[in-house]
């Protein structure tokens, strides 16, 4: 009997141990649950880094925006992401195209529909024309509307106040007092400075600047003002005085024109060696003049060396990555970080600079450029950004630059 009782007790203990073993199973299933929130937190932080790193280094290497169609047909006839162009052509190889590339890349990567809208009347578009384009985008199903250029301001203030459920990204913009508008600006003076410094170090002594917007476009003014400062800094280091012709003529509409090409040709024929073409489609006229005179060009906004062998470098700003970053603020539920918040992207965001992938300068090296860029980032080199109009350059006190305003 005692043996039977002992056997029963032994079995009870075995079952108890088995029972203890089965209670351990839920503990094993609970571990992934405690880890999952940590896994979801990482993507939530990534958008803050994307504009300075990921879009610039990874996406261009794997996806070419030119391989993505400019137009698409959505299944429901609605388009979630819209782009309203600035004056000039959509495919201007510069400001409009760079911004739209950001729209296309983000939409394609995330399976979203997109569409571009061009205000009526081309380079003669009015604020009403721009508003109509924004209204069409909002009524066409847009959740995010990207508007390029400072001229969009008046129309955008009206459209955003009317379509409060739609988010608007204002590239080259400023605060409008509306939480559904994210203004994104750039430190173009830094990029212009780098370009001016580089070409003088390369040996150019007779330079030109042709700007768009008639001297009223803040971004173009900053480019030009920074360019003149960079030219002066390099000339001072080299102990030389250089010539800088400076003009806003024929660029008010940012378009190519026979008049602009004739003026650029005249500059080249009279000794100008290189012109900073700062104004969208104006680039085509200046390149044509440079090609005819065996001269050189500095591109703007994007790397324009792909368009012509006359381009020795380009003053860049990160239109593609900034556009993707701003759109993602909506889709990552982080709009509060940018809505009615003044955002200026510069060297410290890796948002301005010169293209090193297509470097063609021989006397001014990539290493020297990177050292100069680092000096801007750490504050050793300070660039004035107070340019309001072309007169600021004339009166800037640039001791080693002779400015000829035309």
What are the residue ranges of the model-derived segments?
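Positively charged n-region of N-terminal signal peptides that target proteins for export
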Residues: 1-11
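A residue-level marker of the well-folded mature domains of exported/periplasmic proteins
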Residues: 22, 28-35, 39-406
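C-terminal motif of bacterial Sec signal peptides marking the signal peptidase cleavage site
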Residues: 16-19
């Amino acid at each position: 009997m005692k043996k039977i009782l002992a056997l029963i007790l032994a079995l009870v203990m075995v079952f108890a141990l088995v029972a203890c073993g089965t209670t351990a199973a839920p503990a094993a299933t609970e571990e992934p649950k405690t880890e999952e929130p940590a896994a979801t937190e990482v993507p939530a932080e990534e958008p803050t880094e994307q504009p300075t790193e990921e879009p610039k280094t990874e996406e261009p290497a794997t996806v070419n925006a030119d391989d993505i169609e400019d137009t698409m047909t959505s299944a429901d006839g609605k388009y979630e992401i819209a782009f309203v162009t600035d004056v000039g052509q959509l495919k201007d190889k510069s400001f409009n195209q760079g911004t739209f590339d950001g729209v296309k890349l983000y939409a394609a990567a995330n399976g979203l529909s997109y569409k571009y809208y061009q205000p009526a009347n081309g380079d003669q578009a009015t604020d009403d024309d721009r508003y109509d384009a924004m209204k069409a985008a909002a009524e066409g199903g847009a959740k995010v509307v990207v508007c390029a250029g400072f001229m969009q301001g008046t129309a955008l203030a009206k459209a955003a106040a009317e379509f409060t459920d739609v988010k608007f990204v204002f590239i080259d913009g400023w605060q409008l007092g509306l939480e559904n508008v994210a203004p994104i600006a750039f430190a173009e003076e830094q990029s212009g400075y780098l370009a001016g410094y580089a070409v003088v170090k390369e040996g150019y002594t007779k330079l030109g600047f042709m700007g768009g917007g008639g001297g009223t476009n803040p971004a173009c003014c900053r480019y030009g003002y920074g360019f003149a400062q960079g030219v002066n800094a390099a000339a001072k280091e080299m102990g030389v005085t250089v010539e800088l012709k400076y003009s806003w003529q024929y660029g008010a509409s940012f378009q190519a024109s026979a008049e602009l090409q004739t003026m650029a040709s005249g500059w080249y024929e009279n000794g100008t060696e290189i012109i900073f073409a700062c104004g969208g489609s104006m680039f085509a006229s200046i390149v044509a003049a440079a090609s005819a005179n065996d001269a050189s060009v500095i591109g703007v906004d994007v790397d324009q060396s792909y368009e012509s062998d006359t381009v020795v470098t380009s003053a860049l700003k990160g239109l593609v990555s900034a556009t993707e970053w701003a759109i993602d603020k909506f889709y990552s539920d982080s709009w509060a970080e940018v809505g009615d918040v003044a955002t200026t992207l510069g060297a410290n965001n890796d948002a301005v600079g010169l293209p090193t992938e297509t470097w063609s300068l021989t006397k001014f090296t990539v290493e020297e450029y990177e050292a100069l860029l680092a000096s801007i980032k750490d504050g050793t080199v300070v660039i004035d950004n107070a340019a309001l109009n072309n007169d600021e350059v004339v009166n800037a006190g640039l001791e080693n630059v002779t400015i000829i305003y035309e």
